[in-house]
UniProtKB/Swiss-Prot annotation:
It is a multi-pass membrane protein. The chain crosses the membrane at residues 6-26, 30-50. It comes from Polaromonas sp. (strain JS666 / ATCC BAA-500). It is found in: Cell membrane. Pfam families: DUF1328 (PF07043). GO terms for cellular component: plasma membrane. The lineage of its organism: Bacteria, Pseudomonadati, Pseudomonadota, Betaproteobacteria, Burkholderiales. Keywords: Cell membrane, Membrane, Transmembrane, Transmembrane helix. This is UPF0391 membrane protein Bpro_0879. Belongs to the UPF0391 family.
Length: 54
């Protein structure tokens, strides 16, 4: 689960780079939303991984 969260976070970051760079001006809001969603998912997955190890 952590793997998928990190993959989607990277995809959101790439979309943000394109959006903030002016390449896809319409994708800026989507990239912002995806970034925060997947950043939260990555943190939750990391914490869940730590809990399951113990």
């Amino acid at each position: 689960m952590l793997h998928y969260s990190v993959v989607f976070l990277v995809i959101a970051l790439i979309a943000a780079i394109f959006g903030f760079g002016g390449i896809a001006a319409g994708a800026v809001e989507i990239a912002k939303i995806l970034f925060f969603i997947f950043a939260i998912m990555a943190v939750v997955s990391f914490v869940m991984g730590l809990i399951k190890k113990n």
